């Protein structure tokens, strides 16, 4: 194939949790040497969906009917499928993977995707990052395979069908040629149709004329092939929006005390303040993520009524939030990583205060921020002018955090409309009852 060099700037890690369903159950019970499987209804029959190592060693495989599996292995322990619990677990694992990069997405039902482009050097390189990832995932009790490539399709294929490993940038075509067509993430029906005419591996279709291939088997085959080879872009959809600013701190020894957490918050806020000041911005919403040593992640958000940069103000916000959490933070065996992220930032240019300035509203802002953090954002409200001549619609009550941001915009819009329409001023007095107008014939 002439155009076989990937132009992707991604560096994708595909983490495949092959036995996610059985591993989840094994973590919740005492060690049991008997073979285990998860079964679910597919059509009119119960089908084997997942197997542990002992069941695979007995010759069982996915796709067998439950009756066949029991005939082959009478001692098989079978669990019912629980897709919602498995999906929550996969999301929790993906959430934990954000310790490596904010660009983390799901490869459901049993995979996680990470884009480590630009951040692998923080862990000593790609190999060191993958070693740390695999060590931690296995310590949590999950069997995992990992593939690293310049595209989502190639990383997915090498993790699940190519025994894992790294694909150097631009070498996707060379590594994928020997893999089965199912590695392209095409439907089983399409794979079967291709197999009937003798196409079983990716290398069998790479150099075929594209128009006849698309006409007979659909454009999806070519699309997935081009995506795997990096000839067509495929963005990774992150689990959470990527914060414009964030700072993090790993801990050689896990921390658990609240005073240590607050000290870390202030230290990270200083680093964020420097970033924000360079761009003339301040934070409006900030999130604290605490990564526990056992894989659980605690996230706490706080908001402000105006853009701020002062580290002590950020610390004060979280003092109130930590004191009023409905579900207090359980540190477990401690947190080994803390990350402070600015999720919403606004312009906050520096200004010089002179003796002629009007009263500063900083104290009012502090009051709004702290009471909102303690009582809840919806419990502290403010009236905001609206562009309406109906008195009962002339103002609305909004949470103070959003209201103070919209206050100037609301008044400005109202004044501009009145000026453009050349409307008279509102009357100082409204009659309780409208007078009747007499009609003269």
Where are these regions (language model features)?
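Hydrophobic alpha-helical positions that pack around
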Residues: 125-173, 178, 303, 314-328, ...
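Flexible hinge/switch segments at interdomain interfaces of large molecular machines
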Residues: 106-108, 170, 239-243
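Amphipathic, charged-and-aliphatic alpha-helical interface segments
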Residues: 58-60, 172-207
């Amino acid at each position: 194939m002439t155009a076989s060099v990937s132009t992707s700037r991604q560096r994708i890690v595909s983490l495949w949790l092959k036995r996610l369903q059985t591993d989840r159950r094994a973590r919740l019970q005492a060690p049991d040497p008997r073979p285990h499987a998860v079964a679910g209804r597919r059509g009119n029959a119960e089908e084997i969906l997942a197997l542990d190592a002992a069941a695979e060693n007995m010759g069982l495989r996915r796709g067998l009917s439950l009756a066949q599996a029991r005939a082959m292995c009478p001692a098989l322990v079978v669990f019912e499928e629980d897709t919602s619990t498995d999906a929550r677990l996969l999301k929790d694992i993906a959430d934990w993977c954000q310790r490596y990069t904010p660009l983390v997405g799901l490869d459901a039902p049993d995979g996680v995707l990470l884009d480590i482009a630009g951040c692998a050097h923080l862990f000593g390189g790609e190999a060191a990052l993958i070693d740390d990832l695999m060590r931690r995932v296995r310590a949590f009790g999950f069997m995992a395979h990992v593939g690293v490539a310049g595209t989502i399709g190639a990383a997915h294929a090498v993790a699940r069908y190519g025994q894992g490993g790294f694909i150097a940038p631009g070498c996707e075509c060379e590594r994928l040629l020997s893999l089965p067509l199912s590695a392209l993430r095409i439907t089983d029906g399409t794979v079967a149709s291709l197999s009937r005419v003798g196409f079983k591996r990716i290398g069998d279709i790479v150099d075929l004329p594209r128009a006849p291939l698309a006409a007979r088997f659909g454009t999806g085959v070519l699309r997935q092939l081009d995506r795997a080879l990096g000839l067509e872009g495929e963005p990774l959809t992150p689990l959470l929006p990527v914060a414009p600013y964030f700072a993090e701190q790993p801990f050689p020894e896990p921390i658990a005390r609240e005073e240590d957490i607050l000290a870390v918050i202030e230290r990270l806020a200083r680093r964020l303040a420097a970033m924000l000041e360079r761009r003339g911005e301040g934070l409006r919403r900030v999130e604290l993520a605490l990564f526990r040593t056992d894989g659980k992640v605690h996230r706490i958000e706080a908001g402000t009524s105006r853009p701020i940069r002062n580290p002590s103000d950020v610390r004060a916000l979280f003092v109130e939030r930590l004191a009023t959490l409905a579900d207090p933070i359980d540190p477990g065996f401690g947190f080994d990583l803390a990350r402070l992220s600015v999720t919403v930032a606004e312009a906050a240019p520096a200004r010089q205060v002179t003796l002629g300035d009007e009263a500063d509203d900083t104290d009012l802002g502090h009051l709004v921020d702290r009471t909102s953090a303690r009582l809840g954002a919806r419990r502290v409200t403010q009236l905001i002018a609206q562009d309406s001549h109906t008195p009962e619609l002339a103002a609305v009550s909004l949470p103070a955090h959003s209201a103070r941001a919209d206050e100037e915009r609301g008044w400005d819009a109202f004044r501009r409309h009145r000026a453009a329409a050349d409307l008279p001023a509102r009357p100082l007095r409204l009659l309780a009852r409208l007078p009747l107008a007499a009609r003269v014939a």
